[in-house]
Regions:
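Conserved active-site tyrosine of GNAT-family acetyltransferases
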Residues: 121, 126
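Conserved acetyl-CoA pyrophosphate-binding loop and the N-cap/start of the following alpha-helix
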Residues: 85, 89-97
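A short helix-loop-beta-strand connector motif used in the catalytic cores of GNAT acetyltransferases and
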Residues: 46-57, 75
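Conserved GNAT-fold acetyl-CoA-binding loop/helix
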Residues: 17-46
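A short beta-loop-alpha structural element at the N-terminal edge
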Residues: 4-18
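Conserved GNAT acetyl-CoA-binding A-motif
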Residues: 101-113
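Conserved beta-strand in the GNAT
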Residues: 57, 63-80
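Conserved catalytic-core motifs of GNAT/GCN5-like acyltransferases
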Residues: 107-110, 127-144
Length: 150
């Protein structure tokens, strides 16, 4: 599959929201469900993520949105791939883009229960540096991962 990576725009808000919600629901066995209703998530993406962060989207050959990446300063805030397309390199392409965009380093949180994400980020050179007992809105233990280019 050929991927096109590009900056997300306000025209992408609906598709980004749909992908985000599908991916979160598909991962419900490994991550806590969002504490916000779907409409609130859509509004958050349209009003906060799109205009105030660095949003990137991955599109397939047909123009369908198959992945998303959100960067905010040195934070990799969100990375989601179409659930039916995991394991095909889309997430790796997005992480590579994040590293190129932030060559001095990146930080991210992932849930302790999300072992797949932990393996994925560790394969990409991130290392765990801190663990919490659930000091987040989901109340779930999480892990801070850091990548630096050195």
């Amino acid at each position: 599959m050929d991927l096109r990576l590009r900056r997300g725009t306000d025209r992408d808000a609906i598709a980004v929201s749909a992908l985000y919600l599908r991916a979160r629901k598909a991962a419900k066995a490994t991550i806590p469900m969002t504490v916000h209703p779907d409409d609130e998530v859509r509004r958050w993406i349209a009003e906060r993520i799109v205009p105030h962060t660095e949003l990137w989207v991955a599109e397939d050959d047909g123009g369908a949105l198959v992945g998303l990446l959100v960067l905010d300063e040195d934070w990799l805030e969100q990375l989601y791939v179409e659930p039916t397309l995991t394991g095909r390199g889309i997430g790796s392409e997005l992480v590579g883009l994040a590293k190129r965009a932030r060559p001095k380093g990146l930080r991210l949180w992932t849930f302790e229960s999300n072992l797949g994400a932990q393996r994925f980020y560790e394969r990409h050179g991130f290392r765990p540096t801190e663990r919490t007992a659930g000091d987040n809105e989901e109340g779930a233990p999480d892990i801070l991962y850091v990548w630096d280019a050195s």
